[in-house]
């Protein structure tokens, strides 16, 4: 592909398209099911991790899906409002999706639509992570291992931790503020979404880049996703099945 989407082009497209669809009569005609799922997801995230977490993770997910939505409008691809997926789990949600109808006009359009979601999510996930880490505390790791849950760190989160907290001594760890946990979840879901699998953003991007050869990458990616779902977080087994 000769052209690549950039942060600047994303913002430029956002300004023009937002003005266009805000002026249409159907802009505020959000289907009831989308509203109910949004409320249900806010409730499950609030119940699992509190108000600060719920607000921040919903903002990140909404920004991610609106990135796709805005690019769909730019390329005149019919797209639904986001469907949030409530789930009483570790995160309180399985994320959110939008439905696209009709033919995507070009590989450039597919690439831009696919990559705009992660860009939109990161715009909010990064400052939320930094603020959350600033509010977090370094404490001794509890002797009772059953009361302690250690989290893996996405590369960006690890860099932000060192920047905001510094090196943590042995026997200590960062006890994440709920806002920091929302940032961690946002970075984690963004990384997961960029896996080159079918209907995930990474699947769209890899197809736009290499076309039919992406089938090989897809098979490897779906295998890795199933292993992740089985051994790390069983809540994604249903999603893995739907991606087949």
Q: Language model features by range: what are they?
A:
Residues 1-244:
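Hydrophobic transmembrane alpha-helices and their immediate loop junctions
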